[in-house]
Design a protein with these regions (language model features):
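The cytosolic transmitter module of two-component sensor histidine kinases
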Residues: 1, 71-74
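Helix-loop-beta substructure at the N-terminus of cytosolic sensory domains
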Residues: 1-30
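A generic structural motif
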Residues: 34-35, 57
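A short beta-strand signature within small-molecule sensing/ligand-binding domains used
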Residues: 35-44
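Short hydrophobic/glycine-rich mini-motifs in sensory/regulatory modules
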Residues: 44-60
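Sensory coupling linkers of modular signal transduction proteins
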Residues: 61-72
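Sensory-domain boundary/capping and coupling elements
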Residues: 69, 93-98
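Signal-transmission/dimerization alpha-helices at domain junctions
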Residues: 76-95
Length: 98
């Protein structure tokens, strides 16, 4: 999915940012994705049920900010993106039912 390629542009260090979305057992990730200790996650809910995780990580250690190396605005952004992904799935499911 192209969305994983767009997400890093919203973070302070886009060139050092990688993303993984795990949604209903499927993984979508940036080409540079790897597990690191410098990460934020947000649960993806579909109709109130947990269906996946959005993870944004830095590839290298960064200076401490509000939440580890991340700003509060980045926490807000990851939460909004996870909510958006959940709502898109809900819409897709609703259209299939029609």
């Amino acid at each position: 999915h192209d969305i994983v390629k767009l997400i890093p542009t919203g973070w302070q260090y886009p060139e050092d940012t990688c993303v993984q979305i795990i949604l209903e057992g499927k993984e979508y990730k940036t080409d540079n994705f790897k597990e690191t200790p410098w990460r934020q996650t947000a649960e993806i809910l579909v109709n109130g049920e947990p269906k996946g995780i959005l993870e944004v990580s830095y590839l290298q250690e960064k200076p401490a900010k509000d939440e580890g190396p991340f700003y509060l605005e980045e926490r807000t952004l990851i939460d909004v993106l996870a909510k958006f992904l959940g709502e898109m799935i809900e819409l897709k499911v609703a259209k299939k039912i029609e």
